[in-house]
Amino acid sequence: MCTGKCARCVGLSLITLCLVCIVANALLLVPNGETSWTNTNHLSLQVWLMGGFIGGGLMVLCPGIAAVRAGGKGCCGAGCCGNRCRMLRSVFSSAFGVLGAIYCLSVSGAGLRNGPRCLMNGEWGYHFEDTAGAYLLNRTLWDRCEAPPRVVPWNVTLFSLLVAASCLEIVLCGIQLVNATIGVFCGDCRKKQDTPH
């Protein structure tokens, strides 16, 4: 596969994953679709750190767009040198995207490990923090959270989605980093294939 076609494929995948991260993070702000918990201090710190919005979302959107542009044959920098410049930009953007995806992964992993902030026995707090993530396997503990209702499965589902998406983003940004580096030094094979004889 040519470096340009690979870049375009990776870029479109990254854009899709960053949209998944943004939506998942937005849903974490409204447990069970109820906005009444958002205005108070009843959401966990990991929700407010916006790992999915900032890290897996905006910081990965830049390399996604750069990869799509590097894979295209746009008017900006036509020819061999222009495509190599877009590939070079994609190298730096991909490194930036890896950092964003790592941020999303670390925040989401901490959110899974610590559990949600919830009301249990009349007290708000991180009641699953001391279990070191063991609450994930014991669903009977999930019902002990009185408010927000069903917050544990909500957080587990969305943080797990963010962990999976950010892992894929790290892999795809790494692939694009290598692909774009090859594209900078070797160029794009499509130029030779697409020219009429």
UniProtKB/Swiss-Prot annotation:
Keywords: Cell cycle, Cell membrane, Glycoprotein, Lysosome, Membrane, Transmembrane, Transmembrane helix
Residues bearing carbohydrate: N138, N155
Record GO biological process: regulation of G1/S transition of mitotic cell cycle
Extracellular side: 31-46, 112-157
Transmembrane segments: 10-30, 47-67, 91-111, 158-178
Localization per Swiss-Prot or TrEMBL: Lysosome membrane; Cell membrane
Signal peptide annotation: none
Tissue specificity note: Intestine. Overexpressed in pancreatic cancers.
Amino acids binding L-arginine: W124, G125, Y126, H127, F128, E129
Chief location bin: membrane
Membrane topology: Multi-pass membrane protein
Cellular component GO terms, alphabetical: lysosomal membrane; membrane; plasma membrane
Stated family: Belongs to the L6 tetraspanin family.
Biological role: Acts as a lysosomal membrane arginine sensor. Forms a complex with MTOR and SLC38A9 on lysosomal membranes in an arginine-regulated manner, leading to arginine efflux which enables the activation of mTORC1 which subsequently leads to RPS6KB1 and EIF4EBP1 phosphorylations. Facilitates cell cycle G1/S phase progression and the translocation of the CDK4-CCND1 complex into the nucleus. CDKN1B and RHOA/ROCK signaling activity are involved in TM4SF5-mediated acceleration of G1/S phase progression.
Subunit (UniProt): Interacts with MTOR; the interaction is positively regulated by arginine and is negatively regulated by leucine. Interacts with SLC38A9. Interacts with SLC7A1; the interaction is negatively regulated by arginine. Interacts with CASTOR1; the interaction is positively regulated by leucine and is negatively regulated by arginine.
Protein's recorded name: Transmembrane 4 L6 family member 5
Gene: TM4SF5
